[in-house]
Amino acid sequence: DCKAMIAAAAESGAKLMIAYRLHFEPATVAAISQVRDGDIGEPRVFTSTFSQALDPKNHRAEHGFDDGPVYDMGVYPINACRQFFGAEPVEVSAVASRNADWGLDLDDTVGVTLRFPNDGLAVFVASYAMDEYEHYSIVGAKGSVAFQPAFGYGVGLEYDVKTGGETDHRSFPETDQFGGEAEYFSRCIIEDLDPEPDGEEGWCDVRIVEAVRRALETGRPQTLEPYARKRRIEPSQAMGLAPVGDVEMVNASDPSRNAD
């Protein structure tokens, strides 16, 4: 499906962009730039936990893996580690659990390990059966970067950079992340530019998620063909639109079982 959409866009001349709002979020873009510039040395290990307490009545609890925590939440750490390592993984391993007391008829918690060609490792957990939590860190030969919160919107993101025994805390104001990605895409259309998070970027994530599926089904690590993605997040993509006020939900509800 990814390749069909990429081909259709190329044939028609349409602009195709994956709506990855964090590709335009200032804190995320700044941290990726620091790691890319060598501030923490060669990146070695990425770790992340992303979880929520999903209500069993929510539609995402009804369709197994396809609506489960990996496709819903796991794509965030998958995309982040690919950007920080500046490479594509070559091996995928995964394990999963079902917490019987949670009432979800699916693997509600999944742990994934990605091996990168430069011996970098990414390890993350995505879960529908834990308290709401989001965090990631990347540790390099000379330092580390850590985010908490990491993937959400509605708050200003911040992170710590630790090098040489010193910690530099960087805080960024809240932005309208959805407006930022829309403005970026509008510029691409108006100025006839190719979006950075294009169809290929989405395909790179989907092929990893599908490898996670196979790893869970077989109980074995899955090998991915080496692949070189040439485009990555650039500093110029950071968008600083001011946040808007609270928006009323229409025919929707909070997916958490802890919602009031």
Predicted stretch roles:
Residues 167-170, 188-205:
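Glycine- and charged-residue-rich phosphate/anionic-cofactor binding loop of Rossmann-like
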Residues 14-17, 22-103, 219:
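Predominantly a Rossmann-like dinucleotide-binding segment in NAD(P)-dependent oxidoreductases
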Residues 5, 31, 211:
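Aromatic/hydrophobic pocket-lining residues that form π-stacking "cages" and hydrophobic walls in ligand
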Residues 26, 180, 197:
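Residue-level signal for the nucleotide or nucleotide-sugar donor/cofactor binding architecture
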Residues 208-218:
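Short arginine-rich
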Residues 72, 78-156, 172-175, 179-193, ...:
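Contiguous beta-strand/loop segments that form the cofactor/metal-binding neighborhood of enzyme cores
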Residues 1-15:
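Rossmann-fold NAD(P)-binding glycine/threonine-rich loop
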Residues 56-60, 158-164:
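The feature captures the short pre-catalytic strand/loop hairpin that immediately precedes
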